[in-house]
């Protein structure tokens, strides 16, 4: 005869109560993210950190099932499904690696201004990417970057500096055919450009992106001076940026070019911009072939996957995370193949 609740050890009842409480809180947090998206500080931060607070549900489901606790199982089911949807592809990818040989290696890296120069040097030395999409390249540092890396990447393009003083860049071992300013971006967005490369006779359009930075927990005065405004407005800017880049990728793809959109989204899996980009036909390379969570923001293991490589007209082969050096982001390296 199974023990009644009164007969169960106190520690067991306590653990069960904690598990149920976690499940209820995680379910409510998930509802907040899905309903409010990135529209306020709470929902944005919950979406950003979701990989961590959803993960315990994957462990609690089998434990609750083994213990025969229906209440615990019911409480943790929703967060477990969400966690499985996020982590499941990486498990599947481990058992079904892509067999194709890569034709091109692309990397993206938010250098945190000059702080990440050692990480950039390691990335270039150890991984030898053909194309680099870089963020937070201060105008004052460009000459130093060119002096140090120009011999390896003779073709380089820099965006105009944003109001925050930083800019994006595309470095390439392949010739640059054209550079076009991205128009139609919302107010508060950083400048962006489409850099078209000639890769062994094929056209490749590359966009290095750095979506609007959030103004988390900042004062009204600080929000007024932030280029994208307060948290809610910055969220709207990021979504509009994502839609514009997605439309741009569709236009370039329709013109016969392969497309790479890579950079720092300031958003994670449950935040809206990444969903927006993927819903318009761009393939998230890490989700397609990655085998680990790839939490690139913050020191390893990081707290969120905000740095991504998305492609159209190219097939993902492999992806990995590089060493950050002094940056607050880890680089993402993507091996790609031309369609057969």
Give short role names for the model-derived ranges.
Residues 51-52, 83-96, 113, 118, ...:
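Structured beta-strand-rich core segments of catalytic domains in phosphoester-bond hydrolases
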Residues 100-102, 213, 219-224:
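Membrane-proximal, lumen/periplasm-facing interface regions of secretory-pathway glyco-
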